[in-house]
A protein has these predicted regions:
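Beta/alpha (TIM)-barrel catalytic core signal, keyed to glycine-rich beta->alpha loops juxtaposed to Asp/Glu
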Residues: 12, 36, 46, 119-274
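Surface-exposed, active-site-proximal loop segments in enzymatic domains
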Residues: 67-87, 122-129
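Active-site groove signature of glycoside hydrolases
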Residues: 103-126
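Active-site mouth loops of central-metabolism enzymes
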Residues: 1-11, 80-96, 128-132, 228
Length: 274
């Protein structure tokens, strides 16, 4: 919906949303970062006329979107993003502002889930400690807890690409749910110890990126980059096994994470109705 790797028209986003609804899907996820606010704006427009208690919606905080006309036609994989510059900020005030900005873009007062987006060394490298201090000493977690306590958000958690930072966060705050992208899939299960911990803690896991950025549905992307040869070979081996049992590889990839008791949902990142 935000235009990752190629443009997505409003008509395509509308058709995808309507097809999902027709097939019984009622959980929709977005983020300010996706399309540099485009995804939130589109999803809000497509859902705002439906009964609010008929669906679940989640978004994320951790980047403020600052108006900037110098944003190029393609940035960070987003094609034709809107003119807003993503700026990391996990402090108390920034989390609240991000939430309020999302409310307006979505046209929704109460959110079902608010995730802290992309905290961790995978995203921030040697700047991770700086941003982690913003979440802890800087009050980011406190803002999340206040939003939940006030009823403006039903559940809080993390939306990340790595397992280690989730375990750190579970020691800092009582989080309800974690969106984990690409780390418990048919191709990669390095986060299995985290999932076992979440079962014990009663923390739900939403699996994102079940196709590892597309490599499991036939394109050459893995972890948002061109897939290395060893990954391609592993996928070919998985496909051979699936072919033996007459099961499409994408179907196996989609069903695999749902078998774990920690996993409460799976988001696929569909761009069109097909």
């Amino acid at each position: 919906m935000g235009g990752l790797y190629s443009p997505t028209t409003y008509g395509e986003a509308q058709a995808a949303t309507e097809a999902a609804w027709a097939h019984g899907i009622r959980y929709f996820d977005t983020a300010p970062y996706y399309g540099y606010t485009r995804s939130e704006r589109r999803l809000g427009a497509l859902l705002c006329d439906r009964e609010r208690d008929s669906y679940i919606i989640s978004t994320k905080a951790g980047r403020l979107m600052v108006p900037d006309e110098s944003v190029s036609a393609e940035e960070n994989g987003w094609v034709q993003p809107l003119p807003f510059r993503p700026t990391f900020d996990y402090t108390y005030d920034a989390i609240l502002k991000s939430f309020e900005d999302s409310q307006q873009r979505l046209g929704i007062v109460k959110l079902d889930i608010l995730y802290i987006h992309d905290i961790g060394p995978y995203t921030h490298g040697d700047r991770h400690e700086h941003y982690w201090r913003q979440l802890t000493a800087g009050g980011g977690f406190r803002a999340l807890l206040e939003l939940r306590r006030s009823g403006r958000v039903t559940a809080i958690g993390l939306g990340v690409n790595e397992a280690g930072v989730v375990q750190d966060a579970m020691q800092e705050a009582d989080i309800d749910v974690v969106m984990l992208a690409g780390r418990y899939t048919l191709l990669e299960q390095m986060s299995l110890p985290l999932l076992e911990k979440c079962v014990r803690a009663g923390t739900g896991i939403v699996i994102a990126g079940p196709f590892n950025s597309g490599i499991l549905v036939g394109n050459n992307k893995f972890d948002y980059e061109d897939a290395p040869s060893d990954v391609v070979q592993r996928v070919q081996a998985l496909k051979a096994v699936c072919d033996e049992f007459d099961v499409p590889l994408p179907a196996a990839a989609l069903h695999f994470p749902m078998a774990h008791p920690a996993v409460v949902s799976c988001v696929t990142g569909a761009r069109n109705a097909q």
